[in-house]
Swiss-Prot record:
Gene Ontology MF term list: DNA binding; structural constituent of chromatin
Entry keyword annotation includes Transcription regulation: yes
Protein name: Integration host factor subunit alpha
SUBUNIT field: Heterodimer of an alpha and a beta chain.
GO BP terms, alphabetized: DNA recombination; positive regulation of metabolic process; regulation of DNA-templated transcription; regulation of translation
Described function: This protein is one of the two subunits of integration host factor, a specific DNA-binding protein that functions in genetic recombination as well as in transcriptional and translational control.
NCBIfam families for this protein: himA, PRK00285.1
Keywords: DNA recombination, DNA-binding, Transcription, Transcription regulation, Translation regulation
Pfam families: Bac_DNA_binding
Protein family: Belongs to the bacterial histone-like protein family.
This protein's GO CC annotations: cytosol
C-alpha cells in the first residue's frame, strides 16, 4: 500500500483545478497551519464528512523498557488523536 505525501496532494490539486503549484502549495500549507494553530491553542478540529482531530491528556504511568524489562516512568502529556467521521469510515470500509 502506497503512502500519499503532502507533495502528492499539492500536485493532484494543482492538476485537477489548473492552479499553479505554488498557489496550491500555499493553500495546502495554510490549511494545515490553521489545523496546527487550533490544536496548539487547545481547540479540537472538526472537518464535516471527514473526521475530528481531538486533544487528549494522558496521565503519567509506569512503562517498561522493552530491552531490559526495567520499569520507567512515562510522563503526562497531551496527544492529538484522529477519529474518522461516519462518511469516511463507511467509504474506507467499502474498499476492503
Amino acid at each position: 500500500m502506497a503512502t500519499i505525501t503532502k507533495l502528492d496532494i499539492i500536485e493532484y490539486l494543482s492538476d485537477k483545478y489548473h492552479l499553479s503549484k505554488q498557489d496550491t502549495k500555499n493553500v495546502v500549507e495554510n490549511f494545515l497551519e490553521e489545523i496546527r494553530l487550533s490544536l496548539e491553542s487547545g481547540q479540537d478540529v472538526k472537518l464535516s464528512g471527514f473526521g475530528n482531530f481531538e486533544l487528549r491528556d494522558k496521565s503519567s504511568r509506569p512503562g517498561r523498557n522493552p530491552k531490559t524489562g526495567d520499569v520507567v516512568p512515562v510522563s503526562a502529556r497531551r496527544v492529538v488523536t484522529f477519529k474518522p467521521g461516519q462518511k469516511l469510515r463507511a467509504r474506507v470500509e467499502k474498499t476492503k
